[in-house]
Structures are given as C-alpha cells and as structure tokens.
C-alpha cells in the first residue's frame, strides 16, 4: 500500500492506492451518486451511476471499482456524466413497474431520490410494463420483482454479512432476475434466517415487511 496524489474536480488529494475512487471522494466530501454500492459490502459496479471521467481515458470508469493512480485527473460531474446518469435512471424506470404513488417505498426510495437529483422530469423511452412475480410466500417479508433494479445488495448482504446464501441471480439481459434458493418461493427456502437484512438494504420497494 502506498500513497498517491491525484486531482478530483480540481482538488489535489492524497489517497492510498488500495482504496477506490468512490472511497477517496467520500473521504473528501465529494458526493458521487450510487445505487448498487453499500458500505461494508464488496462492490460490483452494477448500476453504473458512479461513472467518472478520467483524463486520458476515453471510456468512463466506475468509481466503486477503480483504484487511484499517481497523477490521475478525475471529474465526477459534467454535462456528459449528468446526461448519462439521467439516462440510466430512465432505463431503470422504464424496465420495471415503478409507480411511486402506490409504492411502499414512496418518499424513501433511492431510485426516486436519484431521479430528482438528476433532474429527470419524464421518461422518454417506452415503458415495458413487465408482468413479474410478487413472492409473498415468506411469513414476514415480500419480494416484488416489479420494483427490483438488480442492484444485488440483497444477494451480497445475505452472502457476506448473514452468511445464509439465500439469494442469487438468474438469467441474463432483460430476463435477469433475483431468485431465492434454487428458484423457489422465498418462504420455502430453508437457508433464510428471516434476519431482514436484505429488506433493510433494498434501495427501492422490491423487498418490504408484511
């Protein structure tokens, strides 16, 4: 581990090279939007909302998985980044059934907060209106796949903190979904300890108590 000096949004900053740019930015009060990141869990770079511009690199890089390097020049905000983040929120909103007025997470939803923060006033792309399962088989909790944004927080907190390994990811692309056990009803999965950690970390109304 060594100390490097880099520039973030015009500020010269020292950081350890085993940190992520997201950690470095947070330490210095620079806010970067995220959806899949959660302190204490390993980062997967799934939501792509924390993308940054790095001078000399044509591709945008995820702050949660990129390490600082000596002399690196980073921009966390620009017209290009704001447009990109707003488009991601648009796609997330259109791919699921996110009807805020009737959602249990209305008023405390991270997706809703990000839409407001990025200035998203309306969704320009067609809504898919998918018909997804609502799993109410668990005695204490409900999983509404219509509002899942595939951040995988539930999967990671169940694996890394609780050690129950109840949740997993199945399929790819638009068919990708979170499954319990071997694609069973949640209430039938013996590994679930009913701890509620997955519900606590869900950023939307996909997981909620009965």
Predicted regions and their residues:
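Eukaryote-biased recognition of intrinsically disordered, low-complexity regulatory segments
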Residues: 1-9
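ABC nucleotide-binding domain "signature motif"
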Residues: 6, 52, 207
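Extended, non-catalytic structural segments that build the interaction scaffolds
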Residues: 9-11, 143-144
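N-terminal cofactor/phosphate-binding cores enriched in small/glycine residues
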Residues: 13-70, 79-80
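Fe-S ferredoxin-like electron-transfer domains
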Residues: 48, 57-191, 200-210
